Amino acid sequence: MDKSSGELVTLTPNNNNTVQPVALMRLGVFVPTLKSLKNSKKNTLSRTDATEELTRLSLARAEGFDKVEITGPRLDMDNDFKTWVGIIHSFARHNVIGDKVELPFVEFAKLCGIPSSQSSRRLRERISPSLKRIAGTVISFSRTDEKHTREYITHLVQSAYYDTERDIVQLQADPRLFELYQFDRKVLLQLKAINALKRRESAQALYTFIESLPRDPAPISLARLRARLNLKSPVFSQNQTVRRAMEQLREIGYLDYTEIQRGRTKFFCIHYRRPRLKAPNDESKENPLQPSPAEKVSPEMAEKLALLEKLGITLDDLEKLFKSR
């Protein structure tokens, strides 16, 4: 629904864009590859609290689940995200029978953004590991009281089967999660920016997060962007990665921004977003935001902010704490 006009807007995926559930884009399910040799060799397990976003699903509401967690192997941007895009496209563009969809393997590879010129062996080497990681990602819904616990455990994709000789791919989804694939708070994600950011996974990850935000988003804290990337390096190194990724997004023409400071917290003010990487005919529709002037902070408040920073507590953490009360 377009809030300004009241018009119902249908979002349809094609080769240049895909409909992505907002929850998966904001939560950091898909993150950059760990570049450090020490970290990259670890069988890294990712654990994400998805309670705030996914308790809105009808499954959670009907069963009274009040906690949702996504657990599984670390899903990267360069291969796993593109495979997930192919899965979303497959269910959107092909006939779903029961809980399964079937399509030619070569077409599925194209939907994943893999050139058809690649050999069958190279296709398998890219798609097979990604399908295993995505199918190995667990979503658990639970509710616990003083005496009992209820829990429903499922997967991002229930099963995947492919046969390159017969040229088929079969994908199976949990019917109770179809709503996740067609989330009512979804956005149309342009793939043009993703393609312009090849091998720049941090910039790709921040793009999917920023593009999921509503129009005229509030300033985004540096800490929130660090959390979205879910890196394991020291904080100062993570800050450099975030700033470099934001600059890369500006270089391809996706956005413009200003970095500001309020107290001891750094923020990014997004002036505009251009997923097509070109200016619209009417630039006034972008509603550029002017950076807010830095607020004066009293010495007492500055001491409190400094203490929170030493403890590793961010303003986002405090906001979540107050919301949970």
From Swiss-Prot:
One Gene Ontology term from the biological process aspect of the record: DNA replication initiation
Q: What's a Pfam family in this record?
A: Rep3_N
> Which intervals of the chain are annotated as region Disordered?
279-298
Q: Name one GO molecular function term.
A: DNA-directed DNA polymerase activity
InterPro entries (alphabetical): Initiator_Rep_WH1 (IPR000525), WH-like_DNA-bd_sf (IPR036388)
Keyword field contains DNA-binding = yes
What keywords is this UniProt entry annotated with? DNA replication, DNA-binding, Plasmid, Plasmid copy control
Task: Describe its function.
Answer: This protein is essential for plasmid replication; it is involved in copy control functions. In vitro, binds to the DNA repeat units, BCDD'D'', EFG and HIJ.
Similarity annotation = Belongs to the initiator RepB protein family.
Question: What name does this protein carry?
Answer: RepFIB replication protein A
Annotated source species: Salmonella typhi
The UniProt gene name for this protein comes to repA
